Design a protein with these regions (language model features):
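Basic amphipathic alpha-helical segments that dock to polyanions
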Residues: 32, 49-59
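A short, conserved structural fragment
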Residues: 57-67
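Short acidic, hydrophobic short linear motifs in intrinsically disordered regions
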Residues: 25-37
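Short, cationic-aromatic polyanion-contact patches
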Residues: 66-82
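Short alpha-helical segments that sit at the start of domains
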Residues: 1-26
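Short, positively charged loop/turn segments that connect secondary-structure elements
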Residues: 37-50
Length: 82
């Protein structure tokens, strides 16, 4: 696993762990980067967080949810047990 893949995997794990602990949480990609990922991994690159969200979305662990003009991300069916 190269450095970029490792950073994405670490960001994805931080997001997954947060949603397991707070299953009703929903946040923008920017908020996820700042509040959920940065404190755990030190990752500051929004592109890495976006890649992690895309990976988790493919797995059904997160889903985008449009609220007005913004997209929030929340736990997907794989984390909600459905």
């Amino acid at each position: 696993m190269d450095s970029a893949d490792r950073r994405i995997a670490e960001a994805a794990a931080s997001i997954r762990d947060h949603l397991k602990a707070q299953p009703e949480a929903a946040e923008t990609a920017e908020g996820i980067a700042h509040w959920w990922v940065l404190p755990v991994t030190g990752e500051k690159d929004l592109e890495v967080v976006m890649e992690a969200l895309a990976l988790l979305e493919q797995r059904g662990e997160v889903e985008p949810w449009q609220l007005g003009r913004r997209f929030l991300y929340r736990a997907g069916p794989a984390l909600r047990g459905g």
